[in-house]
């Protein structure tokens, strides 16, 4: 795995990672990680797909991990979409391109999928954050705080056991100095505001897409990805009993193997 930096249009440096397959690559994959985490937490996933013949790339979102930017502090999500667009230009080759987004990264990837930016050949959306179980009073409070005290920092409220049934996953998450667990009120308001916008726009997706979700996900509940199931060319698979980070569950090999087979089948059809 090699690391480098991508310099953005607004003069930020984003940490990038590259996992090169040992033999000829069948496709290029761009990983888009979730809220608070960083692309280094996806090392085992990237190695899995590199071993399967995918030239795999990841990057730390702005304000995350080792990338520039105030930690978890944006007021609009189009800046993330713009960063994905820049990364697509950087990693794209003559090979087919797959974008794989998880959780908030799945939300960002969905926003990219319905945009006018050049599209990849395939998408994988893992627990895409198109909705959340947030009570109306809390939504109102987030909106008010986002305007009144936009820089106020609040914890995400995430518990380690929500990520995986393997307790070591949560322990490692909270012990990781590159995981930032507090975001600004401005960011929270932007996140809650863009979720329904993305959910309403999914009909504009025109690229074959695989949606995967854990049936016991309490971070992004399974109902959040249901709108995608009605879109032509989208296949949705829910794993009963699995939690938010299916790639970190005991059944991770089954989940990643399913994704790899789906990708291989659709690459052959392309």
Model-flagged regions — what are they?
Residues 205, 211-213, 217:
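Short beta-strand/loop motif that positions the catalytic acidic residue
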Residues 106-117, 123:
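Short glycine-enriched nucleophile-adjacent loop
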Residues 34-44, 56:
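Serine-hydrolase catalytic-loop signature spanning alpha/beta hydrolases and amidase-signature enzymes
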Residues 36-39, 65-91, 255:
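Catalytic nucleophile-loop/oxyanion-hole region of alpha/beta-hydrolase
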Residues 1-23:
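N-terminal cap/lid segment of alpha/beta-hydrolase-fold proteins
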Residues 46-69:
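Conserved alpha/beta-hydrolase
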Residues 235-270:
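Catalytic active-site module of serine/aspartate enzymes centered on a nucleophile-bearing elbow/loop
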Residues 218-224:
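Conserved alpha/beta-hydrolase "acid-adjacent" motif
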């Amino acid at each position: 795995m090699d690391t480098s930096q991508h310099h953005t249009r607004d003069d930020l440096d984003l940490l990038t990672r590259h996992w090169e397959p040992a033999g000829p690559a069948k496709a290029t994959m761009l990983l888009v990680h979730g809220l608070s985490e960083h692309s280094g937490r996806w090392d085992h996933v990237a190695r899995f797909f590199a071993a399967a013949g995918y030239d795999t790339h990841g990057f730390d979102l702005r304000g995350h991990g080792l990338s520039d930017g105030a930690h978890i502090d944006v007021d609009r999500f189009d800046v993330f979409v713009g960063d994905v667009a820049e990364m697509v230009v950087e990693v794209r080759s003559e090979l087919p391109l797959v974008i794989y987004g998880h959780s908030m990264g799945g939300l960002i990837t969905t926003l990219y999928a319905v945009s006018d930016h050049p599209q990849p050949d395939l998408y994988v959306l893992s627990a895409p954050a198109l909705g959340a179980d947030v009570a109306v009073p809390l939504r109102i409070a987030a909106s008010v705080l986002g305007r009144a005290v936009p820089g106020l920092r609040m914890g995400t409220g995430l518990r380690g056991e929500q990520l995986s049934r393997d307790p070591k996953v949560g322990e490692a998450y909270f012990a990781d100095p590159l995981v930032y667990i507090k975001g600004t009120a401005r960011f929270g308001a932007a996140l809650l505001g863009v979720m329904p916008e993305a959910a309403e726009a999914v009909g504009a997706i025109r690229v074959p897409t695989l949606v995967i979700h854990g049936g016991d996900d309490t971070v992004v509940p399974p109902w959040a990805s249901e709108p995608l199931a009605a879109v032509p060319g989208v296949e949705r698979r829910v794993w009963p009993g699995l939690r938010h980070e299916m790639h970190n569950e005991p059944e991770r090999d089954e989940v990643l193997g399913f994704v790899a087979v789906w990708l291989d089948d659709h690459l052959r059809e392309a």
